[in-house]
Swiss-Prot record:
Protein name according to UniProt: Nucleoid-associated protein HI_0839
Keywords: Cytoplasm
Primary location class: cytoplasm
Matches recorded under InterPro entries: Nucleoid_associated_NdpA
Length: 338
C-alpha cells in the first residue's frame, strides 16, 4: 500500500565536543523538500520499517512544549517549516544533555496512510560505503540508513484531533535502546507512556480464564475456548489488526447467559475496546513454556495430564513419548558414552 506525502523536511544535528562539554548544534534547511518520486519512496520505506518495529504507546504531558507547537501547526497558526525548525532546536537542546549524543539527520514528515494523517519524526544515522562511478572508479559515498533506525516516533494526528482522551495516538520505538528514548526522545516530545499492550494482553488472558471458570467448563471445553481465542488473535496479528473485544466476544460461546464482553465490563478488567496483540503473550493460551538453568520446554496445554505429567511435590515433569528427533539425539549421546 502506498502513502501520500504532504510535507517533509530534513535538518541535521551536529555534535561538537569542547573539552568535557558536549553541544548539539542544528543545521536547518530553509525550505521544505520537494515531493519527488525519490522522496516518496524514501518515506514509504521509512513507513514500512516503522510498521515492523516493536512500539510502545504514549501521550503528551499537559505542559509539553512540543505539543503546544504541534497544536499551533494543526490550527494553521504556524507553517510546517517553522514548526520543524523549532522542533529540531528543541531536540538539540535535549540531546545535548547526554554523553551518548551523536550527530544525525532529523526527518519530519506529515503524510496520510489509509485515510489517517500522521506526523513521523526520526533521527537517522549516516553510513559510509563505496560506489562505482561511470568511469568504473571506486569512490567513497555517504547515505542515510533508512532501514536500521531506532529513535523514532509517530503521532496519529487524526486520532489526536478526534479523540482527546485517546491513550494511543503517539507511538515510539522500544527495544534495546528503549532507555535512550525514554531519557531524551520522550522528554523532547514532552510525552509519557500511554496504553500498555503487554498489560492489556495479560489482562485479556486472565479474563478468558476467569470467564471459563465462571462458566464451569471442564478442561476440554476450557482448552477449546482458549484455542478459539488464540486463533482469532493470531488471525488479527497476521493481518496487522488489533484485537477487537466485541468482535472476539461475538465469536465465543455465551456462558451463564453472559457474553464475554459483558463479563469483562462487569468484572472491571480495564480492557480497551481495541488491543494491540502480542504474539509471545498470546501463545500461553495454548502452550506451556519456560526456560532456565540450561533447560527450555514448550508443549501444548492439552498434553498436560495425558502425555505429560507434573508432580508438584517432587518438581518433576514426566514425558511419555519423546519427539523422534530428541529421542534420536539422546540415543546417539548414549552410544557415544558407551
Amino acid at each position: 500500500m502506498s502513502i501520500t506525502v504532504n510535507q517533509t523536511v530534513l535538518h541535521q544535528l551536529v555534535k561538537n565536543v569542547d573539552g568535557d562539554s558536549i553541544k548539539m548544534e542544528s543545521v536547518l534547511r530553509d525550505e521544505l523538500l520537494s515531493i519527488t518520486p525519490e522522496v516518496e519512496q524514501m518515506m514509504l520505506q521509512l513507513h514500512q520499517s516503522y510498521q515492523n518495529k516493536a512500539k510502545a504507546f504514549g501521550v503528551f504531558q499537559e505542559k509539553s512544549i512540543f505539543a503546544q507547537h504541534l497544536n499551533r501547526l494543526l490550527e494553521q497558526e504556524i507553517e510546517f517549516l517553522g514548526f520543524s525548525q523549532y522542533s529540531t532546536k528543541l531536540l538539540a537542546d535535549e540531546l545535548g544533555k547526554y554523553n551518548f549524543a551523536e550527530s544525525g539527520t532529523l526527518i519530519l514528515c506529515q503524510y496520510n496512510f489509509l485515510a489517517t494523517d500522521y506526523l513521523f519524526i526520526a533521527l537517522l544515522d549516516s553510513r559510509h560505503s563505496m560506489l562505482v562511478d561511470e568511469h568504473l572508479d571506486i569512490r567513497r559515498t555517504e547515505y542515510l540508513d533508512i532501514t536500521q533506525f531506532d529513535i523514532a516516533a509517530r503521532i496519529n494526528l487524526t486520532d489526536l484531533q478526534v479523540n482527546a482522551n485517546s491513550n494511543r495516538y503517539l507511538t515510539f520505538i522500544k527495544g534495546r535502546v528503549g532507555r535512550k528514548i525514554s531519557d531524551f526522545f520522550m522528554d523532547f516530545l514532552g510525552a509519557e507512556e500511554g496504553l500498555n499492550p503487554q498489560v492489556q494482553n495479560q489482562c485479556l488472558l486472565q479474563a478468558v480464564s476467569d470467564y471459563c471458570d465462571q462458566g464451569e467448563l471442564n478442561k476440554e471445553q476450557t482448552q477449546a475456548v482458549k484455542k478459539q481465542v488464540f486463533e482469532y488473535c493470531k488471525g488479527q496479528l497476521s493481518n496487522g489488526n488489533n484485537i477487537e473485544l466485541r468482535e472476539l466476544s461475538d465469536s465465543l460461546p455465551t456462558l451463564n447467559e453472559q457474553p464475554f464482553v459483558v463479563f469483562t465490563e462487569k468484572q472491571n478488567y480495564g480492557l480497551e475496546e481495541s488491543i494491540p496483540p502480542i504474539r509471545s503473550t498470546l501463545k500461553s493460551l495454548t502452550k506451556f513454556s519456560g526456560s532456565g538453568k540450561g533447560v527450555t520446554l514448550s508443549f501444548d496445554a492439552e498434553l498436560l495430564n495425558t502425555r505429560i505429567q507434573w508432580d508438584p511435590m517432587t518438581d518433576t515433569l514426566t514425558i511419555k513419548g519423546l519427539p523422534p528427533n530428541l529421542k534420536d539425539q539422546l540415543q546417539k549421546a548414549l552410544k557415544s558414552e558407551n
